Amino acid sequence: TRFAAPELATTKSTMLSALTSMTTPAWAFATSSTSFPTAQAPVNTPLRLRILWNAKASAKAEAQALPALEGPLQLCLSKTPLPAQDPLLSHKTTHRPWYQDAAALLEKHPQLFDVIFLDTQSRVCEGSRSNIYIQDEQGHWWTPPAQGWLLPGVQRQALLNSGLARETELFLDDLLHARAIRVSNALRGWQNALLVQNPV
């Protein structure tokens, strides 16, 4: 579920105020008052359901076929760091200016699954559509802490709750020398990945 920025929300403070004032989860509105679309896809084809919910408690649902993936998933690094401690980074909204270049790159190079972002201190943050994990030499999986510079995904939290992953600060050097890399999101689960050279 993604929060849709209201038409009148022209500033970050307005958006944050709308986000923090909500007491009813998006799915409550979506399941009670939203008619879900029918995607044009063969029977038994996995679908992606996207629910947009705004501060006026209006919900919109979109559905489309979810194509299969072949692993390991290919990742590349963003050339632009994420802004330091932007409060909107930890919310799932349609206000995503820092990911626009990544979206264009992924559309141009469909062999890539995601673009991984660092902050201005070369700390690993997240992908534009996934959380990231690295495995150390002891076989432990680590993911960056959710301290204002990443979206704490549902799948990520499930992995933390189960003890399969732990939080710690990760830097570019950790990523480059990781024993293994994985990414996760609620659509795709926890997937093996590899870092490849940025396409020209």
Regions found by a protein language model. Name each.
Residues 1-4, 26-48, 52-200:
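Helix-start/capping segments and mature chain N-termini
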Residues 3-11:
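Extreme N-terminal basic, low-complexity initiation segments
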